[in-house]
């Protein structure tokens, strides 16, 4: 399991390397769906921190705060560190490409679909800021098709 910072840096670096830098909003959604997909593939969590239900979908607050200075603009940071195990890189890279190609607002719409973990927790705003349990995330079926 990796810290949210480690995974965020990996995504930012990878997206930059393919000429498709991401915004904070897009980063958050890619991280969320990677957590879902990683659990499905490996039966273990990719990211140790919890996601919270915010207006525009699942968010890890510490990551949001790290990149909030960019607003809706693309993140320009680059990182030298890379602690992601080689055994997972092909899986992560393929899924980051897949998710990034959808664009941030499609990813937001996917997290907002009726019945998703975000939808259940956010509850029309009554659950704004509440933690989306890892048990709910493990059951997310958004990306099955």
For each of these PLM feature ranges, what is it?
Residues 1-145:
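Domain-edge interaction signal
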């Amino acid at each position: 399991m990796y810290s949210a910072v480690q995974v965020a840096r990996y995504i930012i670096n990878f997206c930059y390397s393919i000429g498709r830098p991401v915004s904070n909003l897009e980063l958050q959604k890619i991280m969320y769906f990677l957590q879902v997909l990683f659990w499905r593939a490996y039966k273990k969590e990719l990211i140790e921190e919890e996601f919270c239900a915010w207006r525009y979908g699942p968010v890890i607050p510490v990551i949001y705060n790290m990149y909030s200075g960019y607003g809706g603009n693309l993140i320009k940071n680059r990182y030298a560190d890379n602690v992601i195990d080689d055994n997972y890189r092909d899986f992560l890279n393929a899924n980051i490409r897949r998710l990034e190609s959808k664009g941030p607002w499609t990813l937001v719409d996917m997290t907002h679909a009726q019945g998703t973990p975000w939808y259940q927790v956010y509850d029309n705003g009554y659950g704004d800021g509440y933690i989306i349990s890892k048990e709910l995330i493990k059951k997310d079926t958004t990306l099955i098709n």
